Amino acid sequence: MARSLKKNPFVGNHLLKKINKLNTKGEKEIIVTWSRASTIIPTMIGHTIAVHNGKDHLPVYITDRMVGHKLGEFAPTRNFRGHVKNDNRSRR
């Protein structure tokens, strides 16, 4: 279910403060966050945000096409290695 248009998009306060501080300074540095539920807003464009996937922080470079999506969409949490081939000949 989509978020109501009456509400603003969710962005963690700590993340928003860091983005605004870097924008006023004009600096670019990696911002580490655990907030996968935060929505990407236009002020984040051009920044690199390291999003936690449960094990590591994966760096995500924010582009204009990502606006409106969540940060967690770009840091996959599961690693699928493929199905094991069932080789009956090797057991004999």
Curated annotation (Swiss-Prot):
One of its GO terms (molecular function) is rRNA binding. SUPFAM superfamilies: Ribosomal protein S19 (SSF54570). Pfam families: Ribosomal_S19 (PF00203). It comes from the Eukaryota. GO terms for biological process: translation. GO terms for cellular component: chloroplast; small ribosomal subunit. Keywords: Chloroplast, Plastid, Ribonucleoprotein, Ribosomal protein, RNA-binding, rRNA-binding. It is found in: Plastid, Chloroplast. Belongs to the universal ribosomal protein uS19 family. Protein S19 forms a complex with S13 that binds strongly to the 16S ribosomal RNA. This is Small ribosomal subunit protein uS19c. The gene is rps19.
